Regions:
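Intrinsic disorder in cytosolic terminal tails and internal cytosolic loops
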Residues: 1-25, 209, 451-455, 483-501
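Transmembrane-helix bundle of Major Facilitator Superfamily
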Residues: 2-202, 336, 345, 363-366, ...
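12-transmembrane solute porter fold
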Residues: 26-49, 62, 68, 218, ...
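Interfacial helix-loop-helix linkers and transmembrane-helix boundary segments
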Residues: 87, 92-94, 150-152, 209-215, ...
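Cytoplasmic-side transmembrane-helix entry/capping segments in multi-pass membrane proteins
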Residues: 98, 150-162, 212-222, 247, ...
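Membrane-interface helix caps and helix-loop-helix hairpins in membrane proteins
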Residues: 116, 181-183, 206-213, 237-243, ...
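C-terminal membrane-cytosol helix-exit motif in multi-pass small-molecule transporters
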Residues: 138, 190-209, 224-236, 253-268, ...
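Transmembrane alpha-helix termini and helix-breaking/packing motifs in multi-pass membrane transporters
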Residues: 171-180, 426-452
Length: 501
């Protein structure tokens, strides 16, 4: 009997139902999973606030500081799809618990770091164990909440908590750095992990879908090594320049490895990323939208953090609070975009508009200077950026799994979140490279390098990064307008919603 298909080749089907849990137990399980997921999400931003303090304590260079952020994001992104397969093969509960323990151990290692290398290794290990934990959590939600309405409510709660993780990370990072030490931005994960582990051990049942699940070892090696080579190539350009053979060697090698990965996925019996997930036009447009947004957005957090702390003299806590208006604007726009605008106007009208608004906000932010104030040169600009991103990210992430059968919801969610993390990794490395080059060029043209000249060179590096973020968002405007279909998208009844991991 032929198999039913939806959304350009996506197979229809339902998730294998796990034994039904008691209603009250299900919601306690949701609480445990949400706590664990919050730990993973907030770590993408919590260390940003503490970076200046960590840099001063450990003595690493400006050229190396992006690796504290990139190491986590790259490991998480490159291993996320593999983490989902491991959960299917060995069981969701073991994967979830091992992910929690490993994440906590890596956090403790980072908190005790006595140098740059030890801290980067710890951050990479956090990302690796986070890549095991996040897909397991998603699968546990899908199997625990088998009723469609309950599952929708569960994903709504889970997505809201996960979406707030970035803001929690910024604020919590500031409070911990001010009250204790930058190391507590890592140690705090141990406390959270204990709560999640005990709850998971007591409440979660053991389920596994290993009948036909196998590890795609060649695919894993190709995609992980390809992503590493690309990001390392961008980072190497900052210290050795764009004319360095090493820079282009890594970039070309990374491109070839990723091309080989794409080829292998069309031939592998159990691909890490099934081709059917990529066949829908709106889904492909959403993946690109998330990639470009991640590349530009992570730059905003990193460079604006440095501007607020080093130029405006904000404390880490005050810096975290300074980002809250942007987060608030993003949340309001997200609610408006996903529940009102996209259902009525369609993504072709809404998502390019969001990109255009974010582009305008980033261009406006380039007006910062040595004598600027937060209320005039930062606050209105980040609110505009938040509105724009709110009209792009949540609708794009929702559309990325539109029409996907329930059996493919996990890999689709993993893919869209991998796109965000890959974009963040590449964007952080690329913007650091461009910012450093701008500062060097400014100093070369203004001699002698007085304190005033050096301060202005720093501003030039920030504004250059903001301009290139605007370029990325501008590219998103054009790409989204060209690729998204006209009309209102239709959601398959069996498709599970996407969540931000």
């Amino acid at each position: 009997m032929p198999q039913k298909t939806v959304a350009d080749g996506t197979r229809a089907g339902a998730l294998a139902k796990a034994p039904a849990e008691a209603p009250a137990r299900r919601w306690w399980i949701l609480a445990v999973i949400a706590v664990a997921q919050l730990m993973v999400v907030l770590d993408a931003t919590i260390v940003n606030i503490a970076l200046p303090s960590a840099q001063a304590d450990l003595g690493f260079s400006d050229g190396n500081r992006q690796w504290i952020v990139t190491a986590y994001a790259l490991a998480f992104a490159s291993l996320l799809l593999l983490g989902g397969r491991i959960a299917d093969l060995f069981g969701r509960k073991p994967a979830f618990l091992v992910g929690i323990v490993g994440f906590a151990a890596a956090s403790a290692l980072g908190g005790a770091a006595n140098g740059f290398t030890m801290l980067v290794v710890a951050r990479a290990l956090q990302g690796a164990f986070g890549a095991l934990l996040a897909p397991a959590a998603l699968s546990l939600l899908n199997t625990t909440f088998t009723d469609a309405r309950e599952r929708a409510r569960a994903f709504s709660v889970y997505g809201a908590i996960a979406g707030a993780g970035g803001a929690v990370g910024l604020l919590l990072g500031g409070v911990l750095t001010d009250a204790f030490d930058w190391r507590w931005t890592l140690y705090v994960n141990v406390v959270i992990a204990v709560v999640a582990f005990v709850g998971g051990w007591v409440l979660l049942g053991s389920h596994r879908d290993a009948a036909d699940a196998k590890l795609d070892v060649p695919g894993t090696i190709l995609v992980a090594s390809g992503l590493f080579a690309v990001v390392y190539g961008f980072s190497n350009a900052e210290t050795h320049g764009w004319g360095s053979p090493l820079t282009w060697g890594f970039l070309i090698a990374g491109g070839l490895l990723l091309a080989a990965f794409a080829w292998w996925q069309t031939r592998a019996a159990h691909p890490l990323l099934p081709v059917r997930i990529l066949l829908d036009r709106d889904r492909g447009a959403s993946f690109l939208a998330v990639l470009l947004t991640g590349a530009g957005m992570f730059g905003v957090f990193l460079f604006l953090t440095y501007y607020l702390q080093l130029n405006l003299g904000f404390s880490p806590t005050k810096t975290g609070v300074a980002f809250l208006p942007m987060v608030g604007a993003l949340m309001v726009a997200a609610q408006l975009g996903t529940t009102v605008l996209v259902p009525r106007l369609g993504p072709k009208a809404v998502i390019p508009l969001g990109f255009a608004i974010a582009t305008a906000g980033m261009a406006w932010l380039t007006g910062i200077g040595l004598g600027s104030s937060y209320t005039s040169a930062v606050l209105p600009q980040v609110i505009v950026i938040g509105v724009g991103l709110g009209l792009v990210m949540p609708p794009a992430m929702q559309l990325a799994t539109g029409g996907v059968a329930a059996e493919d919801a996990g890999v689709a969610s993993a893919t869209v979140n991998a796109m965000q993390q890959v974009g963040g990794s590449i964007g952080t490395a690329l913007l650091n490279t461009l910012a450093a080059s701008a500062a060097t060029d400014y100093l070369a043209g203004h001699t002698p390098p007085s304190r005033q000249v050096q301060a202005q060179a720093t501003i030039e590096s920030y504004t250059t990064a903001f301009w290139w973020s605007a370029v990325l968002f501008g590219a998103g405007t054009v790409i989204a307008f060209l690729l998204y279909r006209r009309g209102v998208p239709k959601q398959d009844a069996d498709a599970a919603p996407v969540v931000h991991m």
